[in-house]
Amino acid sequence: EIMPSLVGSEMCIRDRGEGVCMLGPVRFHYGCHTRVGNHCFMNFNFTVQDDAPVTIGDHCNFGPNVTIVTPMHPMLPDERRGMVCDDGVERFLCYAKPVTIGHDCWFGANVVVCPGVTIGENCVIGAGSVVTRDIPTGSFAAGNPARVIRPITAADTVRGRFPGIRG
């Protein structure tokens, strides 16, 4: 389900699974480079700058204001200025690295995922984190830069807090 306040009828995503819910506004720079798995939830202000491929697994949830970026820009000032190419046209240097997110991941509010990052399956990324490097499967990671805090284990269950809930 895509909520009416999303972005407009011209928005496209390369591949969107079943049962995806996006609470607008959400934004995709291109959209054609993004794949979203089944039963994912994107809260408001979810933003993907998909200059390179972005792959999101099944059953992923994103809190408000999560941003995924793939472009890389030069560090040196003279390389950030326009450069004239052999064809005489001024261009700005930029390249991009793909982002991959495994199945069953949860992202708290205000998380930023940086270019080239792979996040394994069954991960939780704490609110406000800036993910600059890969996160292994089954990890809770948080901070700026994000680091693995600990593995997620059966002791993390909340089922006992909700009597009558099964599943």
What are these regions (language model features)?
Residues 16:
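Conserved AdoMet
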Residues 26-36, 41-117, 144-145, 151-161:
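Flexible, glycine/small-residue-enriched loop-and-beta-strand segment within the central core
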Residues 20-22:
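Extracellular beta-strand-rich, repetitive "passenger/adhesive" scaffolds
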Residues 112-146, 158:
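C-terminal/domain-terminus segments
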Residues 1-8, 12-13:
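Single conserved hydrophobic/aromatic residue that forms the stacking wall/gate
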Residues 161-167:
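Extended, charged low-complexity segments
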